[in-house]
Swiss-Prot record:
Its cofactor is Mg(2+). InterPro entries: DnaG_primase (IPR050219), Primase_DnaG_arc (IPR020607), TOPRIM_DnaG/twinkle (IPR034154), TOPRIM_dom (IPR006171). SMART domains: TOPRIM. Mg(2+) 1 binds at E174, D219. Forms a ternary complex with MCM helicase and DNA. Component of the archaeal exosome complex. The gene is dnaG. Mg(2+) 2 binds at D219, D221. It comes from Metallosphaera sedula (strain ATCC 51363 / DSM 5348 / JCM 9185 / NBRC 15509 / TH2). This is DNA primase DnaG. RNA polymerase that catalyzes the synthesis of short RNA molecules used as primers for DNA polymerase during DNA replication. Also part of the exosome, which is a complex involved in RNA degradation. Acts as a poly(A)-binding protein that enhances the interaction between heteromeric, adenine-rich transcripts and the exosome. HAMAP family: DNA_primase_DnaG_arc. Residues 168-246 form the Toprim domain. Its EC number is 2.7.7.101. It catalyses: ssDNA + n NTP = ssDNA/pppN(pN)n-1 hybrid + (n-1) diphosphate.
Amino acid sequence: MTSLKYIIKLTFEVDGSVDKPDVIGAIFGQTENLFGQEFDLRELQDKGRLGRIIVEIKNKGGKAEGYIEIPSNLDRVETALIASMVESVEKVGPYNAKFELKEIEDVRAEKLKKIIERAKQILTTWTREKNLDIKEVMNEISGAVKTGELIEYGPERLPAGPDVYTDPNLIIVEGRADIINLLRYGYKNTVAVEGASGKIPQSVVELSKNKKMVIAFLDGDHGGDMILKDLINANVKIDYVARAPVGREVEELTGKEIAKSLSNMIPLSQYLKRQQESIASVSSRIETASARAEVAEQQTVQVVEQPRKEIEIKIPGNVMEEIKKLPGTLEGIIFDENWNLVERVQVRDIITKLENLTNGNASFIIFDGVITQRLLELAASKNVKLIIGVRIGGINKKPENVKILTLADVIGP
């Protein structure tokens, strides 16, 4: 690890006698794929973003307790997320366990104190020798910063970036917070319509007509869909549509995520065509998925024709509404063959819950997680017909009687 910033310190208790490898294995195993590869602990260690996990353990009276230290050079938000992930571990081996965060030590704090004290000394000496006017310096710095601040555009005083007048291209977003976040990463040719009120400001309509390229950059939720509908109904010139990841908002994206979303923008006509396809019957999606599987797995014609009953199944409207709410919740929903709710569970518990269900009780599983080989095989043994997840993991062999889709297949990108 090249630069240590923080040390995550936790304590734990286990209702049984365990060893250090058991604790470390539980941490790796139960945090795997919670937030995708980006926050996989092993990968973070390989990249030098996390250090070696230190475990001290004491077994007494058939129980174990101890503490854990995890060095981190991630930022504050990412480090807090790692701490929360480790706290979510509930079992070590077959025994119930409880992990609790005690503190996140900022190892740079002492160094920062010394730097601040030294800076005070330098400033005192400098002021004494040069008679420096600090206010003058601060005003100069403040003036430079203001060039990247928000401006107000049009008679509606809409939040906008400073290049909204001069840049030949334009990015339209929903609100003020989106503009601020884009400015943070250097995107200054922006204007906000301020919410899905059903009425787009006329100044945005006129502004779009004079731009070479106009991008609607919207949240990855139903609110983003509403904004796009309002823009189209108001005859705003839109050339491309870019969306934040499903369930995410533009205001919370990192610079890397913003760049990726904008690079994935597609022409408006193509986007609308995709939307129409996404609201078509689920049967057509499953049929398409079956055709792809036929080519990928070189299935025989007889195997493709067998799930005819499954292909005809459609997702009811009320279930579609539940699906749209799933992204970002880390929850899963299990339905029976008539789309009646069987149970709502946390993603981390979905394997255990499915194992305990009677065969035939679960026909459809929709969850905010990764579809894995283990889940797929268990679902096949429980006669599950359809699984919908955030994404599909490394699947080596797909059971013929289970169809798999992503949330994007069902509710659009």
